[in-house]
């Protein structure tokens, strides 16, 4: 005798497989850490870790894959630079585009695509290490690949010698840094001197702002302005890095600096700028008159005397 057979209706959905992941999908930074142990172990010290910690970013802007792209293919292939966004294999433009995907909001980087560095194919990874800052690089949050001065000297080697001169700004001693005066990401400031190329100075009206933020007593405005300061800036008389001359002057004796303008040879078009240059009225062969600033003591500008005597 046959028993009663019951047929149970079982939903077919419980046997259905999950849809396959696209081959190159986001796998999460934990998966990266299975192979890249040292990098992953120290990643929490990296400012880029904030993209994970915030919990607010989309996968394409989070952790390792925020910079290197989705890691699905890379993991399936067992590694290899061809299956991931490897910065060492990217063009300068690709590197810049990747970094600016997140780092485009700061005004100090607003002109980076037209900066002298970018035009020379010097981009982010030439100075920065995305996985962590060098031990002697300060501050760590900037992820510098080396100590800042050493990074700059890598290309600007002649500047290293200037900072070893008897009179200099104390960069080698760590008192100030190159970026206290220069913006390596580009600037909208005009260049030092007429017709000169961009030196990436921090933004200012006439390029003297980098100097005046330390030398505040020279800022003015003054009732009687020194025309060379107003028109050409500090480097009309001074060199910025280092010199064998006192006060970083361009020439060893003060009067030879002054005679570059006050020589009686004309105004060289400066009248168009509202500047009339007086020729020197003393005998410059007389040693008594060769230290102009002994009398013209307010040479950067005065509020009481048009000849800067007080």
Cite the ranges covered by each PLM segment.
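Short sequence/structural segments immediately N-terminal
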Residues: 13-310
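Bacterial N-terminal signal peptides
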Residues: 1-13
């Amino acid at each position: 005798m046959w028993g009663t057979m019951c047929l149970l209706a079982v939903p077919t959905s419980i046997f259905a497989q999950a849809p396959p992941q696209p081959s190159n999908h986001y796998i999460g930074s934990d998966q990266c850490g299975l192979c890249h142990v040292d990098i992953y172990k120290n990643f929490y010290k990296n400012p880029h870790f904030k993209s994970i910690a915030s919990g607010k970013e989309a996968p394409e802007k989070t952790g390792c894959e925020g910079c290197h792209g989705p890691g699905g293919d890379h993991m399936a292939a067992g590694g290899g630079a061809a299956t991931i966004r490897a910065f060492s294999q990217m063009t300068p433009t690709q590197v810049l585009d990747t970094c600016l995907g997140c780092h485009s909001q700061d005004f100090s980087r607003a002109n980076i695509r037209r900066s002298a560095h970018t035009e020379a194919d010097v981009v982010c990874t030439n100075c920065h290490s995305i996985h962590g800052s060098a031990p002697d690089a300060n501050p760590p949050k900037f992820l510098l690949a080396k100590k800042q001065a050493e990074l700059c000297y890598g290309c600007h080697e002649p500047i290293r010698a200037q900072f070893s001169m008897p009179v200099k700004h104390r960069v080698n001693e760590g008192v100030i840094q190159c970026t206290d005066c220069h913006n390596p990401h580009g600037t909208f400031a005009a260049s030092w001197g007429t017709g000169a190329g961009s030196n990436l100075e921090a933004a200012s009206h006439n390029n003297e702002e980098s100097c005046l933020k330390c030398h505040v007593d020279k800022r003015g405005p003054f009732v009687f302005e020194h025309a060379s300061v107003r028109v050409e800036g500090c480097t009309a008389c001074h060199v910025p890095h280092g010199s064998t001359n006192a006060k970083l002057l361009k020439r060893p004796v003060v009067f030879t600096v002054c005679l570059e303008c006050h020589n009686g040879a004309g105004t060289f078009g400066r009248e168009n700028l509202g500047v009339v240059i007086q020729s020197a009225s003393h005998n410059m062969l007389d040693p008594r008159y060769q230290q102009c600033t002994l009398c013209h003591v307010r040479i950067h500008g005065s509020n009481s005397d048009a000849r800067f005597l007080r």
